[in-house]
UniProtKB/Swiss-Prot annotation:
Biased composition annotated in UniProt, kind: Acidic residues: 208-222
Protein name: Probable RNA 2'-phosphotransferase
Region (Disordered): 208-235
Source organism of the structure: Thermoplasma acidophilum (strain ATCC 25905 / DSM 1728 / JCM 9062 / NBRC 15155 / AMRC-C165)
Enzyme class, UniProt record, top EC level: transferase
Signal peptide residue numbers: none
Keywords attached to this entry: NAD, Transferase
Role of this protein: Removes the 2'-phosphate from RNA via an intermediate in which the phosphate is ADP-ribosylated by NAD followed by a presumed transesterification to release the RNA and generate ADP-ribose 1''-2''-cyclic phosphate (APPR>P). May function as an ADP-ribosylase.
Biased composition (Basic and acidic residues): 223-235
GO molecular function, one term: tRNA 2'-phosphotransferase activity
Lineage, broadest ranks: Archaea, Methanobacteriati, Thermoplasmatota, Thermoplasmata, Thermoplasmatales
Gene: kptA
Enzyme Commission code: 2.7.1.-
Domain of life: Archaea
Family: Belongs to the KptA/TPT1 family.
Amino acid sequence: MPELRTCHGPYRGRECPVCGKPGKILMNEREVDEVSRTLAAILRHDPERYHIRLDSHGYARIAGIVTVLRKYKGMKWITFDHILSLAETDPKGRYQVSGVLIRAMYGHTIPVDLSDLPEDNIPDVLYYQSSAAEAPLVKEAGIYPSDKTWVHLSGTYRRSYVSGLYHIDDPFILRIDARSMIDSGHDIYRSSDDIYLTREIPPEYIQDAEPEEVTLTEEEKMDIDRVRNKNKKDQ
């Protein structure tokens, strides 16, 4: 993950996007990775491990997270502002800050009520990544949460395909008729610019997507390799 710096505000990488100069470093690449992993563990998966309490909508007090990082990760230097800067510059829009609170916007494996997320500006069509082997069963049975507590959808074919590459070599993309779902009373929530959440998708709203050619950026290739290599080590 790129380092976190500040100049005309916080940013990821070396050069300030405003003036082009290298700003003051807030976290190096290793620290960004470590803090990001800890945030994910607390806000998405296992807050009790770190003695953090989430409210019903998944929010935790930032001060409590700072205490965890100082106590358990040896980051005596970390402050409230470091967490704010990390959340503000997260390239995938994973976090939402509300005053002194922070939450993850998606990716939960623990029950969290995200029904306060916006329901406006939902695209008519959304996309879901599967595999060629599983797609026929998915179209017959519908889509339900598996390792997460919400079904995650993408706003574009490309985003869905790239997301799938973190898990399998050749994702098979399904097209979701989001407009018909909403018209029939199903709730779909917008958790970021290109990620949408719902509880389940009945089979009548699912069909094969028209294949599109997807070319990965070098940054995407590196990030996919990093995640897949880590997953192999963790197995």
